[in-house]
Amino acid sequence: IILVDDGSTDNTEELCRGFYSDLFPIHYFKIPNHGKHVAINFGIQKALGEWFFIVDSDDQLPEHSIENIIKESKKISDNKDIAVLCGMRFYKNGERVGGNLNFKEIDCSALDFRYKYHIKGDAAEAIRTTVIKKYPFPEFDDERFCPEALLFNRIARKYKTHYFNKNVYLCEYLT
């Protein structure tokens, strides 16, 4: 696990040290706050695993989330046309972000998912590390925001995504 702390003022570092073990290593890095996209770029450079999965500090993973992602990754491990695994995001009240879905699995580009199949809502993406390293976010002085859609739309031009209809991420959005 790589944890990039980009400016928290709480006890995140102490908490990580408390969770660390040889079976559950956490690599903690504290960097100045230059925006989420910069923190993601930093984490990508440190990543050594096969898949890169982003979890925001104020969100949670439901039980069996990582297990479900690993199961899905095994289904497509030999298919190099698929670079992204997408489970579904749910609100903490149990509703799926974007409403209910009527599929179990679908393989398509992120652009087709939204514009051809008209599926709404955010998903929780795990990206092959070898692929995401080719598509870093642009970084500009004094710019602290870059939409994640930029990254996924760039990847969608060359690769497909394996979408699976399971809750792997719990979130709340600011309104």
Report the location of each language-model feature.
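A conserved acidic beta->alpha catalytic loop
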Residues: 5-14, 56
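Acidic donor-diphosphate engagement hotspot in glycosyltransferases and nucleotidyltransferases
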Residues: 12, 40, 61-69
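Glycine-rich, basic loop-to-helix element that forms the pyrophosphate-binding segment
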Residues: 31-47
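Short aromatic/hydrophobic "clamp" motif used to bind/position activated sugar donors
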Residues: 52
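Conserved donor NDP-sugar-binding/catalytic core segment of glycosyltransferases
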Residues: 64-99
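Conserved nucleotide-sugar donor-binding catalytic segment
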Residues: 91, 95-175
